UniProtKB/Swiss-Prot annotation:
It is found in: Endoplasmic reticulum membrane. GO terms for molecular function: heme binding; iron ion binding; monooxygenase activity; oxidoreductase activity, acting on paired donors, with incorporation or reduction of molecular oxygen. One of its GO terms (cellular component) is endoplasmic reticulum membrane. Its cofactor is heme. CDD domains: CYP714 (cd20640). This is Cytochrome P450 714A2. Involved in the inactivation of early gibberellin (GA) intermediates. Its main location: endoplasmic reticulum. Belongs to the cytochrome P450 family. Keywords: Endoplasmic reticulum, Heme, Iron, Membrane, Metal-binding, Monooxygenase, Oxidoreductase, Signal-anchor, Transmembrane, Transmembrane helix. It comes from Arabidopsis thaliana (Mouse-ear cress).
C-alpha cells in the first residue's frame, strides 16, 4: 500500500513537471514564431541584419564584438568617438548593413535607426503606441518606478500633462537664485583649495562636487530640504543604479529562463530591500514637507505637482495607494534625472573647456559684461550666448543619455517602413551627433561656433541634434537642466582658470548616462 502511494505521488510529480515544461515550451515556441514573423516582416521591407541563433539571437556576437573592441588610447581626447568602444556592435553592424538594420537578443527583435530622415519620422510620431521598452523599464523599476520616465500609454500622457506644466521656462526662472545659492559652498571650497595650492594651483576632481550641488538643487527645489537631509536617498539611488547596470541592459537575454523565472540576480545587493527603504524614505520626506507647507504659502516643486495631480482628477478622489505610487515614482524620476544628468553635463563641459582655454576667456568676458558682480540671474541668463553655444556643443559631443529606445505596442509606420508590434527601436545619439554627413568633416571637433545661429543652422539635419531625446517624450526637465548647467558653468568659469590635470584619465563609461569612469580632474590656478 505504501509503495502504491509513493508511485502515485511520483507519477503526479512527473505529470506536473511534464505539464510545466510543455506549457513553457508551447509559450516559448509561440514567442519564437512571433519573433520570426517580426524579422521576416522587416526583411521583406529591405531591412537587413546579422543572422540570429534560435536561443539567444545575436547576444553571443554582441559580447564577442564588445570583448574585441579597442578602448580609448588617450591620444586625442576630444576627437575620441567613444560610442565605438561603448557600443561597438552598433558601429560594427552599421558598417555591414547601413544606418537601418535589425538584430535580436533572445526573444526580442530590435530595429536600429540612425538615418536622419527616419530619426525625423520617429521624432514627429505622436502616437501613444510607441513607448519605452518594457523589458528595460521593468529592470529599472527599483530606480524609476512607473513614473514619467518609464510609463507608457495614457498613464504616461496623464503624468506628462501634470509635471510638464511645472517645468515651463517661466516657472523655473525663479529657481536661478536657488541654484546660485547651492553652488556657493562648492565655489568657496575650491577657492580655499587654490589658496593652499599657491602658484602651482591645485588639482580638483569636479564631478563628485557637482553631483552634491545638483542634489542640493533638486532637494531644495522639489522638497524644500537640503542635500544633507536627502543624502541617504541619493546614496540609495546610486547603489541601485550600480547594482542594476552591472549587467548591460543591451545584452539582456530574454530567453526561456527569463520568460518563466525572471532575472533578479544583481550581485550581493538586496534590490528589493533597498527599493523598499528608498520608497519609505521618499514618502517620509514628502509627508514631512506636506505638514511644513500647511504653515507657509511658499510651495516647492513637488507640492505644485501634487496639486496639479489633484486638480486633474476632476473632483474624483485619488485611490490612496495610487496617490502614493504617483508621488514615490515621480520623486524617484526627478531625483535621478535632476541629480546625475546635470552634474555629468557640467563635468564634460569643464573637461572640454580645460582643453580649450580660449573659450574660457570668451565666457568670462561675456559674464563680466552681462552679469552684475559676475553672478548670473534670471534676467542675464538669456543674454549668455557664448555660454549657451559651449553647452550645446558639449551636449553634442557628450549627450547625457546616449541612446533613445522605443517599443511598438502596435504596428507603427515610420515613413515608408512599417514597424511590427513588439519591435524595439534604438537610436544611438553620439553616432548622430558625430556623423560627418550631418555635421561636416569637423564633426568630432569641439567647435561651439557651429551653434552661433542656433540649432536650426548648426548642421544639415537639425532634427538629428537630440541631447534631451526626441518626439513627445523629450526630457520634461530640459529647461530646468539647461538653466542649471548655464548657472554652474558661468559661476565656475567666472571665478577660475583651469587646464586638465596630468592625472586625468579619459574613459567614458555607460551606466544609463555616459559618465567619466575615473572622474574629471582639472588643475585650477
Amino acid at each position: 500500500m505504501e509503495s502504491l502511494v509513493v508511485h502515485t505521488v511520483n507519477a503526479i510529480w512527473c505529470i506536473v513537471i511534464v505539464g510545466i515544461f510543455s506549457v513553457g515550451y508551447h509559450v516559448y515556441g509561440r514567442a519564437v514564431v512571433e519573433q520570426w514573423r517580426m524579422r521576416r516582416s522587416l526583411k521583406l521591407q529591405g531591412v537587413k541584419g546579422p543572422p540570429p541563433s534560435i536561443f539567444n539571437g545575436n547576444v553571443s556576437e554582441m559580447q564577442r564584438i564588445q570583448s574585441e573592441a579597442k578602448h580609448c588610447s588617450g591620444d586625442n581626447i576630444i576627437s575620441h568617438d567613444y560610442s565605438s568602444s561603448l557600443f561597438p556592435h552598433f558601429d560594427h553592424w552599421r558598417k555591414q548593413y547601413g544606418r537601418i538594420y535589425t538584430y535580436s537578443t533572445g526573444l526580442k527583435q530590435h530595429l536600429y535607426i540612425n538615418h536622419p530622415e527616419m530619426v525625423k519620422e520617429l521624432s514627429q510620431t505622436n502616437t501613444l503606441n510607441l513607448g519605452r521598452i518594457t523589458h528595460i523599464t521593468k529592470r529599472l523599476n527599483p530606480i524609476l518606478g512607473n513614473g514619467i520616465i518609464t510609463s507608457n500609454g495614457p498613464h504616461w500622457a496623464h503624468q506628462r500633462r501634470i509635471i510638464a506644466y511645472e517645468f515651463t521656462h517661466d516657472k523655473i526662472k525663479g529657481m536661478v537664485g536657488l541654484m546660485v545659492e547651492s553652488a556657493m559652498p562648492m565655489l568657496n571650497k575650491w577657492e580655499e583649495m587654490v589658496k593652499r595650492g599657491g602658484e602651482m594651483g591645485c588639482d580638483i576632481r569636479v564631478d563628485e562636487d557637482l553631483k552634491d550641488v545638483s542634489a542640493d538643487v533638486i532637494a531644495k527645489a522639489c522638497f524644500g530640504s537640503s542635500f544633507s537631509k536627502g543624502k541617504a536617498i541619493f546614496s540609495m539611488i546610486r547603489d541601485l543604479l550600480t547594482a542594476i547596470t552591472k549587467r548591460s541592459v543591451l545584452f539582456r537575454f530574454n530567453g526561456f529562463t527569463d520568460m518563466v523565472f525572471g532575472s533578479k540576480k544583481h550581485g550581493d545587493v538586496d534590490i528589493d530591500a533597498l527599493e523598499m527603504e528608498l520608497e519609505s524614505s521618499i514618502w517620509e520626506t514628502v509627508k514631512e514637507r506636506e505638514i511644513e507647507c500647511k504653515d507657509t504659502h511658499k510651495k516647492d516643486l513637488m507640492q505644485l505637482i501634487l496639486e496639479g495631480a489633484m486638480r486633474s482628477c476632476d473632483g474624483n478622489l485619488w485611490d490612496k495607494s495610487a496617490y502614493r505610487r504617483f508621488v514615490v515614482d515621480n520623486c524617484k524620476s526627478i531625483y535621478f534625472a535632476g541629480h546625475d544628468s546635470t552634474a555629468v553635463s557640467v563635468s564634460w563641459c569643464l573637461m572640454l573647456l580645460a582643453l580649450n582655454p580660449s573659450w574660457q576667456v570668451k565666457i568670462r568676458d561675456e559674464i563680466l559684461s552681462s552679469c552684475k558682480n559676475g553672478i548670473p540671474d534670471a534676467e542675464s541668463i538669456p543674454n549668455l550666448k557664448t555660454v549657451t553655444m559651449v553647452i550645446q556643443e558639449t551636449m553634442r559631443l557628450y549627450p547625457p543619455a546616449p541612446i533613445v529606445g522605443r517599443e511598438a505596442s502596435k504596428d507603427i509606420r515610420l515613413g515608408d517602413l512599417v514597424v511590427p508590434k513588439g519591435v524595439c527601436i534604438w537610436t544611438l545619439i553620439p553616432a548622430l551627433h558625430r556623423d560627418p554627413e550631418i555635421w561636416g568633416p569637423d564633426a568630432n571637433d569641439f567647435k561651439p561656433e557651429r551653434f552661433s545661429e542656433g540649432i536650426s543652422k548648426a548642421c544639415k539635419y537639425p532634427q538629428s541634434y537630440i541631447p534631451f531625446g526626441l518626439g513627445p517624450r523629450t526630457c520634461v526637465g530640459k529647461n530646468f537642466g539647461m538653466m542649471e548647467v548655464k548657472v554652474l558653468v558661468s559661476l565656475i568659469v567666472s571665478k577660475f582658470s583651469f587646464t586638465l590635470s596630468p592625472t586625468y584619465q579619459h574613459s567614458p563609461s555607460h551606466k544609463l548616462l555616459v559618465e567619466p569612469q575615473h572622474g574629471v580632474v582639472i588643475r585650477v590656478v
